[in-house]
From Swiss-Prot:
This is Electron transfer flavoprotein subunit alpha. The lineage of its organism: Bacteria, Bacillati, Actinomycetota, Actinomycetes, Mycobacteriales. GO terms for molecular function: electron transfer activity; flavin adenine dinucleotide binding. Its cofactor is FAD. Keywords: Electron transport, FAD, Flavoprotein, Transport. GO terms for biological process: fatty acid beta-oxidation using acyl-CoA dehydrogenase.
Amino acid sequence: MAEALVLVEHTEGALKKVSAELITAARVLGEPAAVVVGTPGTSAPLVDGLKTAGAAKIYVAESDAADKYLITPVVDVLAALAESSAPAAVLLAATADGKEIGGRLAARIGSGLLVDVVDVREGAVGVHSVFGGVFIVEAQANGDTPVITVRAGAVEAQPAEGAGEQVSVEVPAPAENATKITARAPAVVDNRPDLTEATVVVSGGRGVGSADNFSVVEALADSLGAAVGASRAAVDSGYYPGQFQIGQTGKTVSPQLYIALGISGAIQHRAGMQTSKTIVAVNKDEEAPIFEIADFGVVGDLFKVAPQLTDGIKARKG
């Protein structure tokens, strides 16, 4: 059976949830083979988790240069593996980096590319949710080694103990024109779950009205142990930082529960959250498009509904 390569997502020595989801998806296409790219020592704390997730093989590509260049080292490693092992497909997370890596890799190896799929089927067929979830379509990429980016949270991880055979591979020296990282600035952080990894997301839109009013959104999120998101309208209005934007030009999420407060539901926003398992919308406009995809909707003032919901959850939790 041919291998299906999976680019491992990790941070601070821990696997991201989407890595297990990708390994599960890869199982449909071939024997899951995880690819870890990073500085020396990166793979050590990840091996057990990758075995548990079902990785039959773990390619370890470690180099001091791995975190000194944007994207290039990862593309180089995957391209080399695609040439040497002739995998059935290469799977990546549909993050900003994942999409760029996928695009560059497909161009490099002359293969087709499927972006932001919500499921993977035999024959390297990708399932897409399009037009705000109105249509579900299938697509198949051309080429010997299709490159597929998978939406985080769309595939349910199904652990299956794998052999986890470790194979060291070289990180090719970056080209002279490769973009080098010269400085780093810390991102805005909080104690909430990562937006793309969270099982519950509470988002606010233009209807929240101001940056100060976003405390209502945060309070509800904290009562649920949820991540906080924002629509593009809220971000453009300066209500919340851009790194929390959800939608076509922001992040894509697929949590078990998505609560939309004061979000009208433009198709661009829906593109980033429409595959959420359960959607709850609160909006004073009963004609708001968000209600078209909501499982539960409340037509009302979010500043009355959200605090009551927060208080009710806290009371239930004791």
